[in-house]
Structures are given as structure tokens and as C-alpha cells.
Amino acid sequence: MVTSSSVIGLTLWAALVSASPVADPLVTPAPKLEDLEKRATSCTFSGSEGASSASKSKTSCSTIVLSDVAVPSGTTLDLTDLNDGTHVIFEGETHFGYEEWSGPLVSVSGTDITVTGADGAYLNGDGSRWWDGEGSNGGKTKPKFFYAHDLTSSTISGIYIQNSPVQVFSIDGSTYLTMEDITIDNTDGDDGEAANTDGFDIGDSTYITITGANVYNQDDCVAVNSGENIYFSGGVCSGGHGLSIGSVGGRSDNTVKNVTFYDSDIKSSQNGVRIKTIYGDTGSVSEVTYKEITLSDITDYGIVVEQNYDDTSESPTDGITIEDFVLDNVQGSVESSGTNIYIVCGSDSCTDWTWTDVDVTGGKTSSDCENVPDDISC
């Protein structure tokens, strides 16, 4: 039953509502269909047409799955300028056709990009087709493998690369890039034919973090040529030239600052800890730390600093300073034919070095060190 008081109340409420101003409804434009598709589409590419199809369709896919892709000779698997947030997944074997050219075989760029390798996936460079003992210094022209250029706030993880023709990862112009659990396996190049197979070459980049890398190669495991805020930890480096700063010099950017190598093993390598700066050039190396580094079976130098790199017959020069160089708990063995520590500094370019718990033994003691900083033993 409806009472008279109810009717009066409803009438008053209706009058108030009709008299009150009504705010304009908040209108949100509907997303464009093509934008939704870009964010939601998963695309799978495979076979000999997979690389070109992926390159053409890359901006239409939020997830790009590369399954047993065969990249044609002389071409790049081009994953540059991806949409923000794109996820790239490698499955099976990615193979590359043979041609003498400079590469790269793979190139990725963008913001908030994730690149991962599925279980059992690997990128097979089949480098023996190019290996001639000359590396990038002559002989056949060899393609670099993987350009991680102009990546921002991105992650590369679980990638397995086998038998790179020459340098593997080129990291350039990137910031806030994390690389996790990367494997580089160039063991087949140990017959003396593979050369300059650097693991990670870093230039003009900031906030680069590399963790859990396992590298077997024939050159620098890591080479920081320029950049700031670089962190490498939990790595194993075998067969190559060790954990390196440089060579620094000869580029438009010759500044290296705030680099840490932490909790890593260097095995059966030519060098362990290494800083190399170009003779006669200018620049700076500062705030470099090697902490908890273990060396074993090093053939040439356990710890080496060369300020006459590229012209070792000349006296070192002062143009590139090495300041605030910290070694903390760096220990291990050098073969008897090698040298434990070798330092060649300019007359006034190596300052503020702090070495603690450094114990490198088994090799020779050098009598050729020059301008060794105070409180440092050569």
C-alpha cells in the first residue's frame, strides 16, 4: 500500500532532482580497433619466410614468437622500433644463411621490450663458415650477431647463442637494460680459427645490468668501451680475454664511469682483470670496481692495466685517466708462463686506487711496470 506520505516524499525527491544541475557525462573515447590489435595480438613466424614476415608485421603484434626461423643470407632479423611493451620469444633453432657481410644477424630496439628464449631454444650462428683466424681484422667479412641498440627499460633473458661468427652482443645507446641468464657458447672456435668473438661490447649506454651470464669465447667476456652505471654479476667467463674496461679511446665518447664486476669466475682465459686505454688519446675511467672475482688457469696476465694499448712499444700517455679503481677480494691462479700483475700507467694518470685482499699467484712478477700508484703492488 502506498501512503500519502510516501507520495509526498517521492514528489519532493523528483522535484529536487529535476531542479539540480546535472554534470556532463564523462566521455572516454573508444580505443581504435587497430590499437587494440597491436596490444593484444600474438603472432608466430617460422621457416624461411619467418624473418621477413616478422619484420613486416612487427608493429601489429604485442607478442612475436619466432619458431625455427631461417634468416636468409645477408639480411638482418629486424626487430627494431617495436611497439612499447612488445614481447619477443625465440623457440627452437634460429639459423642464418651464409654471406660475407658485416651484419648484424639480429637487431632489436624499443621501449619496455622483453626478449626471451624458450626452453631448448638457441640461435645458431654456425660461425665456422666464417672463421679464418682473422676475426674482424681481416680475411672474410663476418657479421656481428646481436644488436641491442636503443633499448630503454627492457629485458633480454634466457638467450642461448652458439658459434657466433665474430662479436656477439653489441649494446649501444641503451638505458635501463637488464640481461639475465645469457649463454654464449663458442667452444667450437677453440681450434684457433675463431677470433674477436667478444661476449658483450658496451658503448654509450647507462644502467646496464648483466646477471648470470655464461660465456665461452675467444675475446673479451665483457668490454665496457664507454658508458656509466654498468653492473655485471654472477658470471662465468671461459676461454677469452677476461672482464675488460676498454679499450677506451678512439671514439666520440671516451668516458667510463661507475662500473662493477661482482661475484664472477674467469677461467682458462688470456687475462683476468683488464683495463686498456688507447695510446695518445683523451678520456676518463673512474669508479671501477672488481669485487669477489676468482681467477683460474690464466695464461697471460691475472691483472693488467695498459695505458699504451694499440702501441705497446711506446711509453704510456696521460690523456685517459684511471681514477678510483677498486679491487676487493680478487684471487686466483696464473699459469707459470704468465704474469700475475702488469701495470703500465702514464706519469700522472692513475690515481686513488684501492686494492684489498688481492692475491694472484702462480705466474711471474713483472719488472716492467711503470708509474704504479702508491700502495699498489705490481
UniProtKB/Swiss-Prot annotation:
Alphabetical list of SMART domains matching this protein: PbH1 (SM00710)
Enzyme nomenclature, EC number: 3.2.1.15
Residues forming the catalytic site: D219 (proton donor), H241
Family label: Belongs to the glycosyl hydrolase 28 family.
Sugar attachment sites: N258
Signal peptide: 1-19
Cellular component terms (Gene Ontology): extracellular region
Organism expressing this protein natively: Aspergillus niger
GO BP annotation list: cell wall organization; pectin catabolic process
Record keyword Nucleotide-binding present: no
Superkingdom as given in the UniProt entry: Eukaryota
Subcellular localization, as worded in the UniProt entry: Secreted
Transmembrane segments: none
pH dependence: Optimum pH is 3.8.
GO molecular function, one term: polygalacturonase activity
Coiled coil location: none
Substrates-to-products reaction catalysed: (1,4-alpha-D-galacturonosyl)n+m + H2O = (1,4-alpha-D-galacturonosyl)n + (1,4-alpha-D-galacturonosyl)m
Protein name, entry field: Endopolygalacturonase E
Lineage of producing organism: Eukaryota, Fungi, Dikarya, Ascomycota, Pezizomycotina
Keywords, in A-Z order: Cell wall biogenesis/degradation, Cleavage on pair of basic residues, Disulfide bond, Glycoprotein, Glycosidase, Hydrolase, Repeat, Secreted, Signal, Zymogen
Propeptide residue span(s): 20-39
Each PbH1 repeat, start to end: 103-125, 174-204, 205-226, 256-277, 285-307, 317-345
PROSITE patterns: POLYGALACTURONASE
Reported function: Involved in maceration and soft-rotting of plant tissue. Hydrolyzes the 1,4-alpha glycosidic bonds of de-esterified pectate in the smooth region of the plant cell wall.
